[in-house]
Amino acid sequence: MGKGTIDALNVPLKDRVTQIELAMERLRWLPVFNSGPYIIVNIPAYQLWAFDDIDQNNANITTMKVVVGKALDHQTPVLMAEMRFIDFNPYWNVPYNIFKKELLPKLQQNPGYLEKENMELVATFGNDSKSVTFNSSAIEALKQGNLRIRQRPGKQNALGRIKFMFPNKDDVYLHDTPSRSLFAKTRRDLSHGCVRVADPQRLAEFALKDQWTKDEIQAALNVPKTQRVILKKSIPVLFFYTTAFFDPNNDLVLYSDIYGNDAILIEALKNSEDLSDQAIFVSNNIAS
């Protein structure tokens, strides 16, 4: 029996009751779900559910493990948005904050770092952007935002082979990962904020079931070229945070409060005019 199990067994009953009460409060904030497919991620559960039809009790449900944002500095936001397209063999456009904090020191120590990581310099992000030669002035141009770094499609790509896009103000998305060993961990808040999925091919089959066959999806994965597929009908995506939730078998499951949101909500509920930001995520995060 591990330490985590022992700690869970030692949680007082009144605290477990509070967890359930907070879950009920969060459910109250959600919009009414229309019939049809949905993709739901419960952040502290490190789990994704893809429903063929959320209104049907006997509908097929695709489930898989996920990796979410780091608790200390890269928390995955709660949101609701519409998945509109999928990129096969995507480029990874390195965000400026990741460049500044993580890549810049490595570049300064090793000018060959970009080539080693299958990365390149570009003036603008875009699949048709031309690579720019790295030279002595490149680092200063990168600091000023006049050049950018992206990682080419391939085995090293941080996004893996598939990226699932649903425009949102936080610029997060679902994607594959080359770091497959992370899914064997119990605690999986390890990303920069995006959600990494354990079985991206199966999720692509779910999202494209009315458009592409499994063979067509496999063919797109086998071609080392970026290909974008627009969904004929967008799919709602919900990133949710609750530490008490029912699994597909209707069994209650309790999760660790990895982001400390339960404690925040307990305090917020003492003043009905001061609820946590999750209470208003529906109005703030539904992408048009």
Regions found by a protein language model. Name each.
Residues 3-288:
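Well-ordered beta-sheet/strand-loop patches within structured domains
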